[in-house]
């Protein structure tokens, strides 16, 4: 009997030091995913070629809140490329991108650093984050996701309650080697 494995990939843009040094650093969009050197992709393109060469489909958890900084087009193009290559596209959320909603975000850094954890928030806050991610998927005209992976795999029971209320029945938030959940809660 063959072992069944689900290959998953987080597909996300990079804050690239913008919170640590906002005067010199800016977030990076497609290049952080494509990793192009001399016109050849050593990131997403390489992964898609390798998966195709072996007849393997993967699930790509596509981060949606980056649209608050970059707009919809950069990640929409990537999501469509993944779908056209026959892969599954699901929702990934890094709440730190919501920091860019405030035009004075640079000034706030000293007194209120960004929080990239979905855990520890109220259910209403988590539902709003999920709703924003789902809205991005709708604007990108990609199928509505059924699964969520939180940034950094941060999770608590509130996240699952919010997922349920937002119609997301599948979670991919637990990575025991990376971020074990508190034993009593999950």
Q: What are the roles of these predicted feature ranges?
A:
Residues 1-147, 153-186:
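Catalytic alpha-helical scaffold of carbohydrate-active enzymes acting on polysaccharides/glycoconjugates
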